[in-house]
Design a protein with these regions (language model features):
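Structural recognition of the beta-strand scaffold that forms the well-ordered cores
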Residues: 57-62, 66, 98-103, 131-136, ...
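Secretory targeting and sorting signals
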Residues: 1-40
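Short amphipathic alpha-helices and their capping/turn segments at secondary-structure boundaries
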Residues: 36-57, 116-134, 139, 187-202, ...
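Oxyanion-hole/transition-state-stabilizing segment in secreted/luminal serine hydrolases
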Residues: 69-71, 114, 118-178, 210
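Serine-esterase "nucleophile elbow" of acetyl-processing enzymes
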Residues: 44-106, 123-124, 152-158
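Charged, often glycine-rich, active-site loop that binds/positions anionic groups
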Residues: 106-123, 267-282
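A structural motif corresponding to the C-terminal end of an alpha-helix
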Residues: 92-97, 186-202, 236-257
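Catalytic His-Asp segment of secreted/periplasmic serine-dependent ester chemistry enzymes
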Residues: 209-313
Length: 313
């Protein structure tokens, strides 16, 4: 993802989760009601993406967490797209008859419909013959790249406190919670558009991995956030994933949890154990992004969903 009601304690974070759920409930249910009845069969079409047989027509939509910036081998410099990102790994396992990866670093939901530099509108790659579509989007809509930069810049003001959380809550409302809630209907519109273009496709909404540990001690200097901002940023990531999970459920798509499988491999871990690079990377990958091992882990989560049925969301 490139681009004073104080809530410092557990009770504050609980209220924030309730607020997020309420906002998403009112917005995403309205958005979900707009899905045409014919599109509701998207999760159970005849094409199917599961299993390992040939003949699959797979399209990958997404941002930099999908494209894999700086991970060798880069095959599209304009979108920082690697041929070892998770869509490429999944496509290799599927032995897809056709595979089109149009993910692009910096993409927001609007780039599903609008060109992004030389990368065309991502939804243009989806057609009636598509039978598997993965979507990983939303992080840039909330400005996650700038959030990371802001929190790093504010940390020296109060190294053991939560200056970043205070910054985003200075109006009495947590602005990141609001941004996540506002992004929900945008993601819903993307899923509706995929359903309309590929009515028989299996649609997977891919969540974001675990970036940070619960306790930020020992993370500096590679991850220079204030101590009490670590749980705030961690919870923001969880709220983003919760939104994606709910919007997927309400729009007849399947959610892929990449957070759980990556816990313990965040950017504060040793180079041997980390799957997310810190702000000063030691492996070829973008700061605060999955490295090659992280892309493999996300591919594993997608594959697990593909091969273990459609029952859960």
């Amino acid at each position: 993802m490139q681009r004073d009601v104080r809530t410092g304690g557990p009770a504050g974070r609980g209220r924030k989760s309730v607020t997020l759920l309420a906002a998403l409930g009112s917005c995403a249910l309205v958005a979900a009601s707009a899905v045409p009845a014919a599109a509701h069969g998207g999760g159970g079409g005849s094409g199917g993406g599961g299993g390992g047989g040939g003949g699959n027509r797979y399209v990958a939509l997404g941002d930099s967490y999908t494209s894999g910036p700086l991970i060798p081998r880069q095959v599209d410099a304009n979108c920082a797209r690697s041929d070892h990102n998770y869509p490429s790994i999944v496509a290799g396992r599927l032995r897809s008859a056709t595979f089109e990866d149009v993910s692009c670093a910096g993409a927001t939901t609007e780039h599903m419909w609008k060109p992004q530099g030389t990368n065309g509108a991502q939804l243009d790659a989806v057609g009636r013959n598509s039978d598997l579509v993965t979507v990983q989007i939303g992080g840039n809509d909330i400005g996650f790249g700038s959030i990371i930069g802001t929190c790093a810049q504010l940390a020296p003001q109060d190294p053991t406190g939560n200056p970043c959380q205070r910054h985003y809550s200075d109006s009495g409302v947590d602005r990141l919670t609001v941004a996540i809630a506002r992004t929900g209907p945008k993601v819903a519109q993307v899923l509706q558009a995929v359903h309309a273009r590929a009515p028989h496709a299996r649609i997977l909404v891919v969540g974001y991995p675990d970036l940070l540990p619960d306790d930020g001690s020992g993370c500096a200097p590679a991850v220079p956030f204030a101590t009490r901002d670590f749980p705030y940023l961690r919870d923001t990531g969880k709220h983003l994933n919760l939104m994606l999970r709910l919007v997927a459920r309400w729009n007849h798509a399947e959610y892929v949890d990449t957070y759980g499988p990556t816990v313990g491999h965040d950017m504060c871990k040793s180079p041997a154990d980390r799957w997310i690079e810190p702000l000063q990377p030691t492996s070829p990958a973008a700061p605060a992004h999955p490295n090659a091992k992280g892309e493999v882990a996300m591919a594993g989560a997608v594959w697990q969903r593909l091969t273990h049925g459609r029952g859960g969301h």
